Amino acid sequence: MKSIKSIFIFLLMLFCRNSFSQSIEVLQSGTKTSIRGLSVVTDKIIWASGSNGTVARSTDGGNTWQWLIVKDFEKRDFRDIEAFDSNTAIIMAVAEPAVILKTKDGGKNWYKVFEDSTKGMFLDAMSFADEETGMVIGDPIKTKPFIAMTVDQGETWMDPVRGDTSKLPTLFSGEAFFASSGTNIFIKRDADYKLIGGFASGGMKSRFFTEKENFFIPMIQGKESTGANSVAINNNNEMIIVGGDFTNDTNATGNCALSNNFGKTFIKPQTAPHGYRSCVIYINEKQLITCGTSGIDISNDGGLNWKLISTESFHVVQKAKKGNAVFLAGSNGRIAKLIL
C-alpha cells in the first residue's frame, strides 16, 4: 500500500512538473530593431520584421539568420509581416504614407503593392485566411476604421466597401487599434469555406467587431494605453483577447477575456496572465501562450488559468502554420524559441 502511494505521489509530481515545463531559448539578440512582425511558415522557415527598416529570415529553424535592411525604407517601422515560403513575404509599414511591400526572392528585392498618403493613415495589422486572401486594418479616418483586402496574395489591395463607409462601424473618440504584434485582427475559413473574421479595438473604448456586429470587451479601458491588443481563435471557434495597459505592464487587471460565441458574451479567466500582454496564440485547441513586455504565460486549459514561465520581454509570438515550432520576438532584435 505504501509503495502504491509513493508511486501515485511520484506520478502526481511528474504531471505537475510537466504541465508547465516550457522554457524560452533566446536565439538572436543585439540588432538595433524592435520586432513586432513575426510569421512562422514551417518549423524551419521564419520571417520577422521591425523598426529601422529591418527584416530577418531563417530557413533552418532559427539556427542562423539573415538580417536585411529594406532599401529606401531604412527609417520605416514594419509592424507586421506575412510570409508564404522561404522566398515570398509581405511587410507593412505603418505611418504616412502607409506602405505594403512584397518580395519573391527571399528579401533581396522588394516592390510596392500598396501605398496610401491619406492624412492620419496608420496601418496596424494584417491577417490571411489562406495564401491568397488577406486583410489589413488601420486606425480610424474620420471615425471609420481603414480596411483593405487582397485576393491575390497581396499583389493588389481593394476597398471591401467600395467607398461606402456607412457599411463600416463608427469608432468612439480615442478608440483605435494597437500595432503591437499584428494580431488584433483575424480572418479564416470556416467548415463551409466561408470567410469569417473579426478585429479588436483599444484605447478609450475596447470592442470586438465582426462583419455585422460589435461588442464591448470586459477589459481595462479608458486611456490611450489601455484595451485589447491581440485576438486569437481556435478550430472550435473559441476566442481569446489579451491586452491591458502598456504603461503599467505588471498590472494584470482586465487584461484577458474569453468567448465561445464571437464576442456576444465574454468571461474572465480564473487566473489571469501576469501583466500587460501584446500577443496571444493557440498552440493547440487547449494550450495557449501569451507574451508582453513583462513576461510570458502559458495556459493548458483554454485560457482559464495562466502560469508565468518567464519575465523576459517579448512583443509577438507565433506558431508554425505547417508544424509545431513556436517563436517569439521583441525589442533589441531578440528572437527566441519556445522549448516544449
Role assignments for model-derived ranges:
Residues 1-23:
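Bacterial Sec-dependent N-terminal signal peptides
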Residues 22-340:
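Residue-level hotspots at or immediately adjacent to binding/recognition sites across diverse folds
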